Amino acid sequence: MEGLVLLKALVTRLLFLLHSLVAVWRVTWVKEEHRYWLLALLNLLLVLETVLTLKFKRGRGYKWLSPAIFVYLVNIMPSLWLLEMHHGNQYCSTQSERMAQNFSRRGDVNQTLSSHRATNGMGNILELARGFVDNLSMVCEPVWTLGLHQTLLLILIIGRWLLPIGGTITRDQLSELLLMFVGTAADILEFTTETLKENNVRTNPTLVSGILVVWTWSMLQFPLDLAVQLKLVCPASVKARGFLRVFLCQYSADLWAIGLSFFIQDGPFLVVRLVLMIYFKVINHMLVFFAVKNSLVMALHFYRLVALIMATRDFMRDHPESPKPEHSGPDQPSESGPSEWEDASPEALPLRTSPVTSEESYPTTP
């Protein structure tokens, strides 16, 4: 079992490393400058994190945070920023046609030479691999960038699934977290694709940078597990300390989910879309639809917040704080009269005195 944990930890981090290297390779290909290979040095952080995790945690994760996912985002974010800031949309159709022509021409050549290389299996494999790499390099830039965005989100979900469970998270909580990640990834992907594909946006580097800042900010929720690990059972001592403590203790996970929607995802996304529509006059039916969707989600979260506040208020009203008993000091012994005995134990029966004669006290002997 320990070996399986170590294997899953290594395989997941290797997947992160390979994907970030592919992104760096694409940046160097687009920019045509080898100095961008220096971005690969960021992967040393992932190597360091792997060594520390294997040494101190035996491959298992941490509580409330996944350092591997955080370092992976640090590695790949600069490459995606450079690709998004590089303007190459106008060459997409030309490059796609050229790639299709080269692919068909190369396929005809391979069919002609296949009969002459029937016995050389390794040569065919190398030729196919070389042709595959050449075809990938000819794919137009927007398609490459979109593919990197899509694979990034898929690898985040699969990687979080494969990473060994650590801390206090359970399998049930992990499955709930992964389902949340799927919905979050879909929202983030449509935000980047729908906003950055507009020509009015692409021609404004400041606006592109602002959208990428919001996108980067929204990606920071993936390394956190607070939405499922903050489901606590409040002890009795907390329930006697006031409304705010009870509210924060009972609904900490719900409050974290509401905060994510307001300040990390739906709130910033709505602000960006409103700025595009009102200030920059970028209006289309998809942008309007997703703006309404973000508004509706935030309204529902606000409705839930009000419902949680009312539920806590009803709980405090039904469970009032009981008065604390007064403890007497060591030098002041407590004294109580008969009236206090009757109040303390109403079901107790009072003792009645009955006269006992001397004859009834002791049995007589014959």
Swiss-Prot record:
Alphabetized UniProt keyword annotations: Glycoprotein, Membrane, Transmembrane, Transmembrane helix
Residue stretches spanning the membrane: 4-24, 36-56, 64-84, 138-158, 176-196, 208-228, 258-278, 282-302
Chain positions covered by the region annotation Disordered: 319-366
Compartments reported by the entry: Membrane
Transmembrane helix keyword on record: yes
Glycosylation site positions: N110
Keyword Transmembrane helix: yes
Mode of membrane association: Multi-pass membrane protein
Location (main, coarse): membrane
Entry's Gene Ontology cellular component terms: membrane
Record-linked InterPro entries: Transmembrane_26
Top-level division of the source organism's lineage: Eukaryota
UniProt feature, compositional bias: Basic and acidic residues: 319-329
Biased amino acid composition, Polar residues: 354-366
Protein name: Transmembrane protein 26
